[in-house]
Amino acid sequence: MERIKELRDLMSQSRTREILTKTTVDHMAIIKKYTSGRQEKNPALRMKWMMAMKYPITADKRIMEMIPERNEQGQTLWSKANDAGSDRVMVSPLAVTWWNRNGPTTSTVHYPKVYKTYFEKVERLKHGTFGPVHFRNQVKIRRRVDINPGHADLSAKEAQDVIMEVVFPNEVGARILTSESQLTITKEKKEELQDCKIAPLMVAYMLERELVRKTRFLPVAGGTSSVYIEVLHLTQGTCWEQMYTPGGRVTNDDVDHSLIIAARNIVRRAQVSADPLASLLEMCHSTQIGGIRMVDILRQNPTEEQAVDICKAAMGLRISSSFSFGGFTFKRTSGSSVKKEEEMLTGNLQTLKIKVHEGYEEFTMVGRRATAILRKATRRLIQLIVSGRDEQSIAEAIIVAMVFSQEDCMIKAVRGDLNFVNRANQRLNPMHQLLRHFQKDAKVLFQNWGIEPIDNVMGMIGILPDMTPSTEMSLRGVRVSKMGVDEYSSTERVVVSIDRFLRVRDQRGNVLLSPEEVSETQGTEKLTITYSSSMMWEINGPESVLVNTYQWIIRNWEAVKIQWSQDPTMLYNKMEFEPFQSLVPKAARGQYSGFVRTLFQQMRDVLGTFDTVQIIKLLPFAAAPPEQSRMQFSSLTVNVRGSGMRILVRGNSPVFNYNKATKRLTVLGKDAGALTEDPDEGTAGVESAVLRGFLILGKEDKRYGPALSINELSNIAKGEKANVLIGQGDVVLVMKRKRNSSILTDSQTATKRIRMAIN
């Protein structure tokens, strides 16, 4: 109070007022503070003070021709007095209003194109639906998320080249546009932005938003795709969440999602082939996602998921140094260990050889629905702090950590034999054996683990063997926390190696990933995934395998035909016939193959015997390892549409139908392509060549017994008659000539006679 009174007294003296309002401030420190540098020290004050003046704005002299001196209300818009220290005009804020109402208009056509990301965001929000607000504890964990919906996936350098080329095409500097996406985008944007009057710098900024993925490390409780992240501030607080459904999709989320599905399908398929690594690479290189080559997407897309990372490792790309076990991403935060192989007995007295990690280590574990911090020593879990969305998710994390700890009581909790196999029917390694076992049923594991009394610690509670919460007791070393554990934030990538069986190791030889870690979850891709590789034919079921196999033969018929006659073994070993084998009943595979190969050999031996349609039809059956047997077949079975369907060795069937008139083949009613050559030309030669040395007497005559196959004819004595099966299942009566002299004329007459006999 005293001070205020004193000030009042001072202010009442006119001299004080004069000093405060008129004298200059000449204290150097103060002058320095407010005048050093270009940075405005008190922008709000400066703005208020400027706007209080009559003419706070300066403009180019040309403004005097473009704006009247006074507006309709007679208020002055600009001052005739020059701006001190420049040849600019002093302008009133009212001039801006006048300009906005009456000034020239420009074309707005480019705005939606340049500010595309903003316009699209408005649309998504307009069509999105916001649900109720729920108040509850939010378990948020920091994850690296994409904050920029609707972007392409160019690297900063690639984007820079595109932007320079589009916005400043005449600037000097070498720009190399190499990738397909760069070229497409550049062409598209140049067309869109012709005669664009928006400031080039603005256009460049907006293009950057469209081309480059921007990620931030943010606390998230719900969806992590970019259309959820853009409304993060609306959907989750510290103690509340609001339900939200986005009003649109964006390509980058679709690409991320479809990439994961494609990678999972490819890894699962590669796992069961003879050479998993080679197959995986072949599939990655021949697959397209939304019309873009998968390998290009893998090079640019930073998505971290087990299958995606295996594909990246196979391509020689760097990946994150964290490793995966039981679907959780483990990152070692401190400590170290050495590996030693030890043998131990399960509760069922089965011997397991396990690589034991000796030493103290700490890890963070991050999964889709639960996270944890794990501290362990050699074969001992010291502490596990876990948090998750629900009981089930927490239990999953606890099982993984218990198995990972390699504790003896976990191994002794095994009941029954461990004989889990992967898709290729190979036994899983011991750690994954244990994991699968307890994921099926962890009751014994939790019961045998042991419990301990707990102290009351803020934000932590105990969890009992039946997975119910408790404040008194808890599984030994295990606590449940309200707080999530953040994902590993570093974007550091390391060089890795991959072996034939798709196990990915870091340079120290630690396994980071293996196909066992790839999720079995099936999703539906948002973008079209086109697998050109024959190994992926079966992804759409048996029918697709059947159609694709025959389509492939017809497409490559010229090359196949030559191989068929010169190097059949090479042909039979082609991987394009692999998927087909799964359609042939196991018991019959070898017999069918032996039968078809013998038939083909006869066609080759007897010069000119060649029936295109029949070769195409039977070729896939010859690919299996053949069994030597005398079995003859009139039809071969394939398992499609849930049952066995028959392919007739001679003649058409619903499965394989060749239309002579249109020369088109339909497989299960689906068009499989057209034969370019005329099969009949080939067929004519077949019969004539086969029947050299025989006289054709006419149609089949039942008195001479059942129809013989072509190779059975050789057993006939000269002068004997027999029925014989030729070509597309027609039967004619023949007699073996008594003399060999007239054999040559047979081929010409045979062709004519067959036609007569058949018709």
Curated annotation (Swiss-Prot):
Compartments reported by the entry: Virion; Host nucleus
Site location (Avian adaptation): 627
Gene3D superfamilies per UniProt: Polymerase Basic Protein 2, C-terminal domain
GO MF annotations in UniProt: RNA binding; RNA-directed RNA polymerase activity
GO BP annotations listed: 7-methylguanosine mRNA capping; cap snatching; DNA-templated transcription; symbiont-mediated suppression of host gene expression; symbiont-mediated suppression of host mRNA transcription via inhibition of RNA polymerase II activity; viral RNA genome replication
Function: Plays an essential role in transcription initiation and cap-stealing mechanism, in which cellular capped pre-mRNAs are used to generate primers for viral transcription. Recognizes and binds the 7-methylguanosine-containing cap of the target pre-RNA which is subsequently cleaved after 10-13 nucleotides by the viral protein PA. Plays a role in the initiation of the viral genome replication and modulates the activity of the ribonucleoprotein (RNP) complex.
Subunit structure: Influenza RNA polymerase is composed of three subunits: PB1, PB2 and PA. Interacts (via N-terminus) with PB1 (via C-terminus). Interacts with nucleoprotein NP (via N-terminus).
Name of this protein: Polymerase basic protein 2
Protein source organism: Influenza A virus (strain A/Goose/Guangxi/345/2005 H5N1 genotype G)
Gene name of the record: PB2
